[in-house]
C-alpha cells in the first residue's frame, strides 16, 4: 500500500547590507518534543561599511537604537478555505545579498542559533537564542537578542505577544554558549508564531539588525503541534481548522455520522483523483473538522489517513484541543 508522507520544510532568510544568512531546520517529534532551529550567520567584511571609525560606545548606542526600532513583522499566511487552512510551511529560499567576491575578506563573524521547542511532557513552548560561534580578528562589542511568542485564536485574526525576552551581551559576556531563553506554559489551544530580533556591532562598522519570523503553527493545550500530513497521490495536505476555540457540541446536537461515509468517500476520491490502488482496509476516513466541533459529512471535510497516523497522530492531537 502506498503511504502518505510527512513533509518537513526548510526556511532560508537573508539580509542585505550585512552578509547575514539564516537557515531554519525542523526536527521530527521525538519523545513528545518537536524543535525548530534557525541558524543566523552575521559577518562584516574587512572593507567595512562605515567610512568613519566609531568608538565602542557609539557602536553600542547605535546597536541599542537599531534593536529598539526594529518591528516584529508577522509571517506570511496561506489563504483559508472556509473553516480550514493548510498550515504546512512552504519552502523559502530568498537571497538578496551580493555574494562576496575574491577581493572580499571576511574578518569577523558571529553565529547565533534561535530555537522554538514544543515539549508535550511539560505542556510548554521554549524559545531561546544561543551564540554558537565567534570567528575573526575581533569579536563584537555588543550582541542583543530578543524573541517574542505571539498567539491567537483565529488563524487570520489578531495575535498577542504572550512571552518575550531581551538580552544584551557585552564584554566577556559575548562568548560561545551564551544563551537566553524563556518558557511559556500552554493552557489552551492557540495559533503560535515566534519573532526574533538580533543585533550585533563591531567597532569600525555600523551595527546590523535582523528580524526573523517562523511560520504560524496550531498548537494544542498539551504543546502538541497539529500534524503536518501530505497525500502524495492527491497532492493535498491535511487542512487544519482556522479557529483554535471552536465550540464543542453535545452528542445530541451534532451532525450524525453517515453510516455509509466510508464507501461514499472512496467512490468520490477515485472519481476526483483517480484510483491510487490502495488497500483501503488499512485506511481511516477522518473528519477534518470533527463532528463534535460542528463538522459535517461533506466530502470536503473528509481526509483519508493510514490507521497509524489517524490513531497515533491526529486523534491524540484533537483530544488535547479543548
Residue ranges, per PLM feature:
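Bacterial N-terminal signal peptides that target proteins for export
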Residues: 1-9
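Short amphipathic alpha-helical segments
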Residues: 5, 20, 27, 318-322
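Bacterial N-terminal signal peptides
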Residues: 9-18
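Sec-dependent signal peptide cleavage junction
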Residues: 17-33
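Nuclease and nuclease-like effector domains acting on nucleic acids or nucleotide cofactors
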Residues: 31-284, 292-322
